[in-house]
Amino acid sequence: MLGINYKPCNEDFWQGRTDSEENFLAFRWHQWIKPINLNKDDLSPFTGKLGFAFIGFCCDEGIRRNKGRTGAAKGPETIREEMANLPCCFTDEVKLFDAGNILVENISLEEGQDLLSKAINKILSLNLFPIVLGGGHEVAFGNYLGVLSHLKTINSKPNIGIINFDAHLDIRPYTEGMGSSGTMFRQISDICKKEDLNYSYLCMGVQKHSNTLELFKTADKLGANYVFAKNITYGDNWIVFESLDDFMKAQDYIYVTVCSDVFSSAFAPGVSASQSLGLDPEIVVRFIKYILRSNKVISFDIAEVSPRFDQGHVTANLAAVVIFSVIDTIAKIYGLGL
């Protein structure tokens, strides 16, 4: 049981246009989404060809601890609203489920991340692909822990690679038990060291002006890999693709996480730390699709959508389109795309 801080799907968020109530080719996501309550003990594993489960992480405590601009706790609501009208560009054998939200209210960040970990573990055990809606980027720690917990039932030492699209390395120092939205990948490194696990971390879109020299030194010490945003924007992308290939070949599983501040503020103004020289979303989506085609990706999240700063829901809409691209790409991999 996930307790009172888990709230099952609120179907009110799934409202939109209806062109037909019978012709699936005219369906939008709000017509195809099904609620799933992770608190139920009698849930049976999904036996269809391909299923996705959305779960929101309504939290910005990590952002507050990181002295950023709070507001991302409301992100999952607005992302759902933007996803509602997306078209079903897949066959009816692809199923979409909404697993509700983890609410980090009147509990600690660490308790919230533990709840998310349990939820991710359960979603994976149901044979569904988790897509987490943030929430601050502290969502990454809970998502990773859930993936790790699930994979340990298969292999005591799973080989998991992390690909993070982010302007920040997020490997800041932290006090034990008090992480933030800027510490997750250092916390994961510490867990890997403690449990003798492989630590494989690649950060795409790093901004030199957003990280201290000590953080780059720490990244090198930890064996983390990173690609600067300027090298993606102005460099030879084939070199970046080769770097991705080298990284992905060494992994058995890949967890992909996107911090919305990786994007230029022209496309993503509603974030905690906006980036005037961030990446063009088209470039990021191209890399995400390439990573997905490795067929190793086990979980995905997009974080730091903050409605408080998001005039016209521009950033939430971008997050929805990124998620659309994820589902569209995986559906095509399974031969279920249209």
UniProtKB/Swiss-Prot annotation:
Listed under catalytic activity are: N-formimidoyl-L-glutamate + H2O = formamide + L-glutamate
For this protein, the record's CDD domains field holds: Formimidoylglutamase
State the Gene Ontology terms under molecular function: agmatinase activity; formimidoylglutamase activity; manganese ion binding
Q: Which UniProt keywords apply?
A: Histidine metabolism, Hydrolase, Manganese, Metal-binding
EC number(s) given by UniProt: 3.5.3.8
Residues annotated to bind Mn(2+) 1: H137, D166, D170, C259
Asked whether the keyword Manganese is assigned, the reply is yes
Does the record's keyword annotation contain Manganese? yes
Q: Where are the transmembrane segments?
A: none
Query: Which family is annotated?
Result: Belongs to the arginase family.
Entry function? Catalyzes the conversion of N-formimidoyl-L-glutamate to L-glutamate and formamide.
**What is this protein's record name?**
Formimidoylglutamase
What organism does the record attribute this protein to?
A: Clostridium tetani (strain Massachusetts / E88)
